[in-house]
């Protein structure tokens, strides 16, 4: 088919561009799902197939469907070379362990600002003064914004780890959480802090699936957010940035490059910038989009966007400004 002829060279190129431990996610409707799976088996190899994730794309499916009302899209996942890297899904609330240990030597440890989460119901935005409420002492005043300190800080207590060991753990992806005012800090090792993702990206309340696992939005959520950002309804059915962030968090490291062959409204770019702002990452994005003309009757054309590329470029500019503010 024309669709297969269009996809084949792009997927072939995508495989060649992936690093050895790279991953590809491909969003597809049910109509071409079978064909896409066969195509990817040929290009990436059946052994490198990971999963077909199901995503609830709409909460308002067409009411006039005669057989069924389709709510789902699918995301096909392959690795270039299947490996042992674990994917991070839902964060485990109970996956943390105490860093304090009675009887250990009292020592000072320096923590990076973006590696310690202060539970926001206990630590609202503002200044946390130097204090020793119990067994842990905060050496200096710090400012907390949205659950994170705005600068590195030092804690003093009977800690299990030395500074060198702490630094090694941080390099492996270990993070920390402080849940109460007594500052009893706990650590979350990267491999222990997450469930593996299920193949349902957004659970809905049905007899089969009755637990919502994450905060991934729908097309309607994405349209509302984009309309607010662009001050007009200029792009139909954009993907939610929460979907891209959820997938990226499976495996993407803070210095990785993310390529989108069909960038459309540049959701990938927006999601990557937002991720970087949240964890001080240095991820980069490459967006590829043909300059497909907008219809002269469309809101996009009336707003001055003559092709889809112009929409994406303006979204990147506006999203970048919003993320920095």
Model region roles, listed by residue range:
Residues 4, 33, 241-322:
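Conserved S-adenosyl-L-methionine
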């Amino acid at each position: 088919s024309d669709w297969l002829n269009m996809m084949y060279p792009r997927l072939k190129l995508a495989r060649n561009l992936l690093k050895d431990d790279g991953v590809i996610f491909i969003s597809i409707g049910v109509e071409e799902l079978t064909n896409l799976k066969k195509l990817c088996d040929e290009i990436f190899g059946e052994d490198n197939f990971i999963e077909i994730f199901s995503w609830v794309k709409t909460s308002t499916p067409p009411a006039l469907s005669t057989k069924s009302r389709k709510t789902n899209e699918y995301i096909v996942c392959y690795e270039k070379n299947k490996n042992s890297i674990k994917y991070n899904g839902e964060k485990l609330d109970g996956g943390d362990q105490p860093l304090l240990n009675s009887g250990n030597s009292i020592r000072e440890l320096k923590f990076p600002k973006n590696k310690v989460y202060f539970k926001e119901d206990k630590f609202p935005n503002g200044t946390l003064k130097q204090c020793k409420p119990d067994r842990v002492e905060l050496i200096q005043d710090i400012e907390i914004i949205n659950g994170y300190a705005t600068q590195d800080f030092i804690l003093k207590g009977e800690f299990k780890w030395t500074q060198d060991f702490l630094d090694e753990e941080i390099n492996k992806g270990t993070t920390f959480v402080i849940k109460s005012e007594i500052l009893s800090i706990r650590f979350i090792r990267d491999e222990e802090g997450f469930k593996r993702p299920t193949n349902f990206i957004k659970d809905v309340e049905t007899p089969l699936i009755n637990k919502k696992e994450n905060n991934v939005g729908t097309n309607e959520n994405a349209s509302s957010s984009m309309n607010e950002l662009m001050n007009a309804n200029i792009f139909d059915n954009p993907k939610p940035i929460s979907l891209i962030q959820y997938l990226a968090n499976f495996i993407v490291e803070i210095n990785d490059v993310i390529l989108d062959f069909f960038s459309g409204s540049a959701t990938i770019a927006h999601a990557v910038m937002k991720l970087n702002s949240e964890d001080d990452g240095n991820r980069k994005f490459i967006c590829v989009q043909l300059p497909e003309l907008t219809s002269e009757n469309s809101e996009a054309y009336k707003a001055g966007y003559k092709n889809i590329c112009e929409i994406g470029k303006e979204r990147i500019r506006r999203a970048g400004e919003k993320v920095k503010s």
